[in-house]
Structures are given as C-alpha cells and as structure tokens.
Amino acid sequence: MELARPRSNFQSDLDFCPDCGSVLPLPGIQDTVICSRCGFSIDVRDCEGKVVKTSVVFNKLGATIPLSVDEGPELQGPVIDRRCPRCGHEGMAYHTRQMRSADEGQTVFYTCINCKFQEKEDS
C-alpha cells in the first residue's frame, strides 16, 4: 500500500516549488521540471502557455553621484580620545560593522577627523 503524498506547503505559481518554496528551473527538453533542492517534480505540460519575461536595466555611465569623504558614515560617528598614527591629531571618529560571522565580534573603524586616515580593529 502506497502512502498518499501530503498537500503542498506553499500556495504558488509555477515559478516556485510548492513543497520547499525554491525557485524552479525553466522547463527544458525533459518531460518533467524537477526542483533542485527537494526533488519535487511537475509535468512540463503544466508549464504550457507560460510566458517568461526578463529585463536588464543598464545605468548610464557616471549617473551616480560619488559621496565626498565628509558625507561618509565614518565621520558621523562619535569622537573618542585616540591619537591618529599618521598625523598625530588627538580625536578619531568611529563606527562599527559586523564584517565576520555573527558569533564573532564586530569590526571597529576609526577615522581621523583631521586627515581622514582610517584604521580598523577587530573586537
């Protein structure tokens, strides 16, 4: 006796697998479309009449406005008593970012408010 297959986990169109939600590949020359993640398969005839449209948007060269150094986030943080190794100025702004995995410490970026020299410290 064969067990009945449970109903799908997702309500979706044929772009996504109804079992795991992954994006299904485009139909090819095979008789079935098979989900590469969970192995769910549908008959390729179920995709009949489906239209796939793609578009690529190219931005004009030079269309973005570069930020000046004064506008970056590194100079908007708090200032601490830390001597710049390049110019010797006392006072550096800092900000933190999670650059490594979540179970490791953050990276602290220090920026000299005088000469804009930047250094980092892994904490």
Curated annotation (Swiss-Prot):
SUPFAM superfamilies: Zinc beta-ribbon
Gene Ontology BP, a term: DNA-templated transcription
Zn-finger region bounds: TFIIS-type: 80-120
SMART domains (UniProt xref): ZnF_C2C2
Signal peptide residues on this chain, from the entry's feature table: none
Cellular component, GO, one term: RNA polymerase I complex
A molecular-function term among this protein's GO annotations: zinc ion binding
Pfam families: Zn_ribbon_TFIIS
Intervals of motif Hairpin: 103-104
Zinc finger (C4-type) boundaries: 17-38
Binding positions (Zn(2+) 1): 17, 20, 35, 38
Binding site for Zn(2+) 2: 84, 87, 112, 115
Main location: nucleus
Known role: Core component of RNA polymerase I (Pol I), a DNA-dependent RNA polymerase which synthesizes ribosomal RNA precursors using the four ribonucleoside triphosphates as substrates. Can mediate Pol I proofreading of the nascent RNA transcript. Anchors into the Pol I active site to monitor transcription fidelity and cleave mis-incorporated 5'-ribonucleotides.
Domain notes: The TFIIS-type zinc-binding beta-ribbon domain contains an acidic hairpin motif (residues Asp-103, Glu-104) that likely coordinates the nucleophilic water and magnesium to cleave the scissile phosphodiester bond and release the mis-incorporated 5'-ribonucleotides.
Protein name per its UniProtKB record: DNA-directed RNA polymerase I subunit RPA12
Species: Mus musculus (Mouse)
